[in-house]
A protein has these predicted regions:
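A metal-dependent hydrolase metal-coordination microenvironment
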Residues: 1-109, 113-129, 510
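C-terminal functional module detector
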Residues: 22-25, 35-40, 55-65, 104-111, ...
Length: 515
């Protein structure tokens, strides 16, 4: 076995995904699922601590991550009427969505899926084709929008908002960027060039021969490009398949929901705090590397622990702290993502807001009365005005100040392509400065602002262009978790590991469609 073969992980994952149904009996799952669901019910305290039943669907064909998280609105009694649909059953998202449809109709319950870790999907999370190699049509778009209303924009395996290759004019695009797919087996897009016999499954790499294409793999892997691709597809077929809201999540496999940079407990047990975790390999694979001597990642290894991200959390504007209300907020996409800080952010769109509304003490009530919240569509345009927006962002009470509030806009062009632009809506007077001391892993809240309340109107609005808008909130610079580790454990970090970063929040979009 060649330990430096970059395809080892691909073959390993394919082996897992290719397990025959009779390898494990469905009956084996019943007591496990019963124990899990009843344990969740045991700790669910409506109004105090809400625990949602869920599981992860985990296909990764050719090492491309297509994972989804399935979340239930229901209690154990209803959830136990089914056995979870797994990647052994199918690696096609359409089959998962059909399973969710059947669950809803047969049990009277309700469940949705949330796409997970798109940045390492090899361009497959927001594709141009369905799982059978056919162009996306309205049936696919409607099914996906119904059963998969949310996308995870940030987590421990990197940030999925955008990539500097996709957004070269965005100064904040290169944040916790991962390259390649989950197994680091591919850095270029692989395209089918021939069919081998009667095998027609485009998600099974054994069915096709591949070649590397010079085009990068990023389109279809990142949230912003997915939103833009959705507009482009809508212009062709009349339906947007990627009209999703945003959340963040940890993806930690330790049951420790600790994403603070100074209290980060890693992804797996082997990446919990300790002197050697920074230069060890994620999931315990590979060999020790003295990164202080300048060596990065050997070609046969997976991701190094220094690359994992202390992220993220899901913000949900629910009417009450209960399963039912949180789930309903998921469905209406009134959600946002943060990379770890508990930033609070509101985002409303309207044709009728005025700057005076941003000073109203009943800001939130005005937002709902005169406009629509994040995750919504602007109503039909009845005036010649540009859309205007109200934004409120407040710092984590125990965290760093805020440096700026931005609106990210995407729109379609006459030729069917799409464009994007990032607008600075509000800036602190000292934006661009830093107080980080990497030697002591400290910073000061002597710069930035504790809160921004903003009114913004689109200065470039074209009523003929489909568009989306979402808010990005940027903190002042703070130490990265690896810097805290360096100080606590006395590790010497190589130069290529960032000492500081700027954490952030992303809201779900608000969409505009021409009449």
């Amino acid at each position: 076995m060649d330990e430096e073969d970059p395809n080892l992980f691909t073959e390993f994952v394919d082996g897992l995904n290719g397990l025959l149904d009779d390898t494990f009996s469905k009956d084996d799952y019943v007591p496990i699922w019963k124990e899990i669901t009843e344990n969740v019910d045991k700790f669910n305290q409506p109004g105090i601590f809400t625990a949602l039943i869920g599981y992860e669907w985990t296909p990764a064909p050719t090492g491309d991550n297509l994972h989804r998280v399935v979340v239930f609105k229901d209690d154990a009694k209803i959830a136990q009427k089914i056995i979870p649909f797994s990647a052994i059953d199918s690696n096609k998202p359409e089959d998962l969505w059909n399973f969710l449809k059947e669950y809803n109709s047969s049990t009277g319950g309700e469940a949705i899926s949330i796409s997970h870790n798109s940045n390492i999907s090899g361009g497959r999370m927001f594709p141009l084709e369905n799982s059978y190699g056919e162009p996306i049509d309205s049936a696919y778009a409607n099914m996906r929008n119904r059963w998969e209303p949310l996308v995870e924009a940030t987590q421990v395996k990197g940030d999925s908002e955008t990539h500097p290759t996709l957004s070269p004019d965005d100064a904040f695009a290169d944040y916790e960027t991962w390259e390649g797919n989950i197994g680091r087996s591919q850095t270029k897009r692989l395209v089918r060039i021939s069919n081998t016999g009667d095998c027609k499954d485009p998600l099974n790499y054994k069915c096709y021969k591949y070649k590397e294409e010079e085009e990068d793999r990023y389109i279809g892997s990142y949230v912003r490009s997915g939103l833009r691709r959705g507009l482009e597809i809508e212009k062709k077929i009349g339906t947007n398949p990627f009209k999703f809201g945003l959340i963040g999540s940890t993806d930690n496999h330790t049951a420790l929901a600790a994403s603070e940079e100074d209290n980060f407990f890693g992804k797996f047990l082997d990446s919990e705090p300790g002197p050697g975790r920074v230069d060890s390999c994620m999931a315990g694979c590979g060999r020790p590397v003295n990164m202080a001597d300048g060596e990065d990642i050997p070609s046969g290894d997976l991701w190094r622990n220094w690359q994992i991200t202390a992220s993220g959390y899901a913000g949900v504007w629910a009417r009450d702290n209960t399963r039912e209300e949180i789930f309903d907020a998921f469905k209406r996409k009134e959600t946002y993502a943060t990379t770890g800080p508990r930033i609070a952010v509101r985002f409303f769109g309207s044709w009728e807001f005025t700057e005076k509304d941003s000073f109203d003490p009943n800001f939130v009530e005005v937002g709902y009365e005169k406009g629509v919240p994040m995750g919504s569509d602007l109503p039909l345009r009845e005036t010649n005005k540009s859309p205007n927006f109200l934004i409120m962002a407040a710092k984590d009470p125990n965290g760093a100040n805020l440096e700026r509030v931005q609106v990210v806009k995407g729109w379609t062009n006459k030729d069917g392509s799409s464009s994007e632009k990032v607008y600075d809506v509000d800036l602190s007077s000292d934006a661009g400065s830093s107080t980080v001391n990497a030697e002591t892993a400290t910073y000061k809240n002597s710069i930035g602002e504790s809160q921004f309340v903003s009114f913004w109107s689109d200065p470039d609005f074209n009523p003929r262009e489909q568009s989306f808008y979402y808010v990005r909130v940027i903190e002042i610079p703070t130490p990265r978790w690896t810097t805290y580790d360096s100080v606590v454990f006395g590790n010497k970090l190589p130069k290529f590991i960032p000492r500081s970063h700027q954490e952030r929040a992303y809201t779900s979009p608000i969409w505009y469609s021409p009449e």
